[in-house]
Amino acid sequence: MYKLKALNFLKKQLTRLKVVDMEASCLYIYKWSRMIRKIESDDNPKASAGSTSAKGVYQFTDASVQTAKNRMHNMGFFKEDIREISSNPHNWTNEQADCMFLANMFAQKGSDKLLGKIAYGDLDAMKEAYYKFHHTNPDKATIKRVDKLMVI
């Protein structure tokens, strides 16, 4: 399960979304994020895309790091915690990576509806949110990998 900062953030968001079963909903979001880590990088913090600047477990690009930090700030994370996050995703702790991922997801316009469904284990919503808010231009190989690894 997520560590303290990521888990506290997630619980605040799920409370805002009025989920019924907090424990189960946290677990579904956690499992979904682990599937994304596996799809993106085989859960390797030192992974690099090669063809883009994407790196780390969630494959944040150089350009998306500052955007995610801004979203963390807008979503209520402490400035000190944000400041401690390197601009290089290879250097992130698991908790920093998870906080960046969660804030980046929950801050995006239109994400609440899909994240609310993910909190109840909706696999179609998991895939849709992944394609809409994280990997916005998947090739056939990525789609095949998602279909193989994103399972409940």
What would you call each of these model-derived segments?
Residues 1-87, 99-113, 120-152:
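Cell-wall polysaccharide-cleaving catalytic domain and substrate-binding groove, primarily
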Residues 92, 96-97:
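Mid-length scaffold segments of soluble, non-membrane domains
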